[in-house]
Structure formats: structure tokens, C-alpha cells
């Protein structure tokens, strides 16, 4: 992906985040993001532990 495509992608993400942040659904989005953060944190830690122990090559 070229740098211009990356810049366009991050621009779109920032516009969507700005729209969600300046409307009333920001609290709901924050709750969903918090839940997803903890889910992916647990998945990361489990895979990290498995990678360091069981699946060592």
C-alpha cells in the first residue's frame, strides 16, 4: 500500500471518529471499544503464553 493510500485510510478513520465523538453515541462507542479492548487483550495474552510455551519451534 502506498503512503497516499495509508493517509487516505487514516483520514477516513479520523473523520468517522470525529463524527462519533461529536454526537451522542460516543458513550456507547466507548463502552464497546472498552469491551473489545479487554477481549483482544485476553486473546493476546493467551496466544503469547502459548507461543512461549507449547508452540515453540
Swiss-Prot record:
Mode of membrane association: Multi-pass membrane protein
Pfam families with a match to the protein in the record: DUF1328 (PF07043)
Predominant subcellular localization, coarse grouping: membrane
Subcellular location: Cell membrane
Keyword flag Iron: no
Keywords on record: Cell membrane, Membrane, Transmembrane, Transmembrane helix
GO CC annotation: plasma membrane
Membrane-crossing residue ranges in chain numbering: 6-26, 35-55
Family: Belongs to the UPF0391 family.
Protein name stated in the entry: UPF0391 membrane protein BBta_5399
Organism: Bradyrhizobium sp. (strain BTAi1 / ATCC BAA-1182)
